Amino acid sequence: MFIIAIGDVHVPHRSYGIPPEFKKLLVPEKIQHILCTGNLVSKEIHDYFKVLTSDVHIVRGDLDENTSYPDTKIVSIGQFKFGLCHGHQIVPWGDRASLAALQRQLDVDVLISGHTHVLEVFESNGKLFVNPGSATGAFSNISNDVIPSFVLMDVQSNNITVYIYKLIDGQVKVEKIDHVKQQ
């Protein structure tokens, strides 16, 4: 089962759109779920995600005007509970201890957050933490030099294979991390 973690797109205010190098990889009917950390800013990106899969979960970013998106969301997929938040609620932004506190509060196996626009995937105390970065490379308050990125997760039983996609100098680079759910 394929899950895309993506966010901080900022179209049209900070970016023209998802890079074509990524769009070639995001094929309809191959992806079962999209978990988005927000800051889409425009309806255009939401509609694009719905073309990829009907199962799209989005939380509200600090710049999203769509107030129907929740601040946090829990999604059960297979044997895993995924928690989703934009990340502007985490103080300081991206702080691992604060992320772990939210993970415990939501009682999830995987916490997906954004806001920093910096890709980060790590394990802590048997839990998986994913920040997919910015899919468009939109600048942030932290950095003007943001590498476009997103994360693909392949969920099989109690395993998640995490594929990290980065667009560097016009080339898509992929890294892989394996995570096993602790019982």
Swiss-Prot record:
GO CC aspect terms: cytosol; early phagosome; endosome; endosome membrane; phagocytic vesicle; phagolysosome; retromer complex
Catalytic activity: O-phospho-L-serine + H2O = L-serine + phosphate; O-phospho-D-serine + H2O = D-serine + phosphate
Pfam families (alphabetical): Metallophos_2 (PF12850)
Localization per record: Membrane; Endosome membrane
UniProt-annotated binding residues for Zn(2+) 1: 8, 10, 39, 117
UniProt KW Zinc keyword: yes
Enzyme Commission (EC) number: 3.1.3.3
Any GO BP: retrograde transport, endosome to Golgi
Binding site for Zn(2+) 2: 39, 62, 86, 115
Keywords, in A-Z order: Endosome, Hydrolase, Membrane, Metal-binding, Protein transport, Transport, Zinc
Gene Ontology terms, MF aspect: L-phosphoserine phosphatase activity; metal ion binding
Cofactor note text: Binds 2 Zn(2+) ions per subunit.
Membrane topology category: Peripheral membrane protein
Function: Plays a role in vesicular protein sorting. Component of the membrane-associated retromer complex which is essential in endosome-to-Golgi retrograde transport. The vps29-vps26-vps35 subcomplex may be involved in cargo selection.
Family membership noted in the UniProt record: Belongs to the VPS29 family.
Protein's recorded name: Vacuolar protein sorting-associated protein 29
Source organism of this protein record: Dictyostelium discoideum (Social amoeba)
